[in-house]
Amino acid sequence: MAGDTGANPLFLGWVKEWWDTAREHNTKGAPTYKKAYNSLKACPLTFQHPSELQVLNGFGPTISQRLTDRLKQYCEENGLPMPKHPKRKRTLELESALAAAGAVQDEQPPPPKRARTARPYVPKLNSGAYALLMALSELGPKEFMDKTTLIAKAQPYSEHSFTVPTMANKSYTAWDSMKTLEQKELVWLRGLPSKRYSLTDEGWEVVKRMKEAQNLVDGVAGSANTSRNAIASGSGTSNPNRSENVNPNRQDSGVKRESRYTPLDLKPFVTTTATPERPLQPKPHTANSEYSIIIDSDDEDPKYDEEDRKPIIRDTTNRDYIDLVADGDSVPDESNLPHFTPIRLAPGSFTVELVLDTREVQAKNNRDHIQEELSKLGVRPVMRSLELGDVLWIAKCKQPGWLNRLGAEGDEVVLDYIVERKRLDDLIGSIKDGRFREQKYRLKRSGMKNVVYIIENYNIDMDIRRQYQDAMDTAMASIQVVNGYFLKKTDTIAESIRYLAAVTYMLKEIYESKPLFVIPTQVLTAKNYLPLVKHLREKEPSRGYYISYPAFASLVSKSEMMTLKDVFIKMLMCIRRLSGEKAIEIQKVWKTPYQLVKAFEACGSDENGKKKQKVLVMSMLSHLVDRRNVDKGLSERIADVWGFL
């Protein structure tokens, strides 16, 4: 608190302490404490009681009461009298003093602002306002549309949801753009409480300018009926194109693709080309890449029915497959690897499907957003609890029982692509508790050739961002340089979903036109899997070898994949306040649980020995700083669990 200056250093120091704690834990109260701290620091008046602080910006009953409790504790500890609660007269005097202090202004008038020429309003492409105007342009001059119908018509034109907030901790949706349109008098509102909407004359003028801005000559009315969502993805933010719905399960789906993909090679850029005759289409986003997916339209307009839009649900869990693959013996060299005849799946006998983890959600109150948006883009996800990763792709046999007859389980084969999606706040949390390192380690042990990390932008406190920026940059660099994984950065969850859909279409192009070779499950063990896969890739780099989904689930099951080191670290992290970073440092000193128990045992069980046990971990890690350091309280807690107190 010594560094806190101002007229109220005691109160200022406590608020600063709470602000620092809120920033450290990335809580929502951090901006509130920051506002209160800056307000109190700038105030020249001295306050006697915390309740008087409510005349300042940022101070409410909660902070004032917390300061009162802290002041009471401070007075009791130091033998000081507790200040009395101020009277109303004192509060009025403070308000007058603050008003007088804020009324002092520079007598010199500010320089006159230069007049700006107002530009004609044209909403941003694919914004909420753009989508609403496009949907309303389908109406005739005297027709109106209710909110439910309007949202359904407008959603295909917008890259943001009209019902779900763009950011999990914000309330803004694309529908909030309606307020802007009403303020600019571009939309008529009729009827209460059942509201109906229509374009004003000015609204029609804006639609006309939108048309001119896109260099299109076709009329506005009815244009949305010939449009659909297409998939777009690039190195930066991309805009969705519009075309007709394409059902990937149809034999003649209208999907034209350039067959220039190299096998097992995931390229970061996937672009979309729209037909030139389609009216009111946004210009497609093109990426600097020779790889592209061209999605064109049929003469007809195929539509998904409601059943096609629903995700595929699988009830079988990975726990059912834990004992499927045996542990086996170690493999000292290639001569100990098994010889086998691979199972061959002919082209056309399977379809490529996206598997989405059931825990992968946008927000707790909207758990189905990702699968619903994928379904709108023509990708029916298979919903399943995944032990590893958030998204992966499988080849699903069209003929049930085919794999069983040939020596593998189930009807699904895991392809060599897996995705780990992390928002910035989740990335920071996983770095702090050690999950980030553990996940990368388990991905490496999975044998997957193509690992993609999607790092999704998120609105976090700027102080938290600055505090962990170096850690985030280091983590993202290690993903690419150290581990050799592909890193995809997106700005919104909508962009992440479009990217996943684009990858799905690309993998369909890569795999569905060639045979798949599957390793029989009976030759696999947990010890020979990685050496076998490595040997096959070196021996036949042009041919991929895959395993069934049940075998993969058994191999990556957390209970089978964890080493003694992993188990020990997880055991340590069960202790309250013991983070992943601290657990890793403890494991570096005592390699196994046995060594830690023996270290406590060596301290002795008498009174002097118990004192040594309480400070054992703290003394051994005293050279560490910051978050890796173990204080006395945590050291005693560890001794309570592992020692002989």
Curated annotation (Swiss-Prot):
Q: What does this protein do?
A: Interacts with eme-1 to form a DNA structure-specific endonuclease with substrate preference for branched DNA structures with a 5'-end at the branch nick. Typical substrates include 3'-flap structures, D-loops, replication forks and nicked Holliday junctions. May be required in mitosis for the processing of stalled or collapsed replication fork intermediates. May be required in meiosis for the repair of meiosis-specific double strand breaks subsequent to single-end invasion (SEI).
Q: What is the lineage of its organism?
A: Eukaryota, Fungi, Dikarya, Ascomycota, Pezizomycotina
Annotated keywords: DNA damage, DNA recombination, DNA repair, Endonuclease, Hydrolase, Magnesium, Meiosis, Metal-binding, Nuclease, Nucleus
**What EC number(s) does the entry state?**
3.1.22.-
Where are the stretches annotated Disordered?
Answer: 98-119, 219-310
Location of the ERCC4 domain = 353-459
Report the SUPFAM superfamilies cross-referenced here: DNA polymerase beta, N-terminal domain-like (SSF47802), Restriction endonuclease-like (SSF52980)
Q: Which family does it belong to?
A: Belongs to the XPF family.
Q: Which cofactor does it need?
A: Mg(2+)
- Determine if DNA damage is one of this entry's keywords: yes
Q: Which GO terms describe its biological process?
A: DNA catabolic process; double-strand break repair via break-induced replication; mitotic DNA replication checkpoint signaling; mitotic intra-S DNA damage checkpoint signaling; replication fork processing; resolution of meiotic recombination intermediates
Gene Ontology cellular component annotations, sorted alphabetically: Holliday junction resolvase complex; nucleus
Q: What is this protein called?
A: Crossover junction endonuclease mus-81
The Acidic residues compositionally biased stretches are 296-305
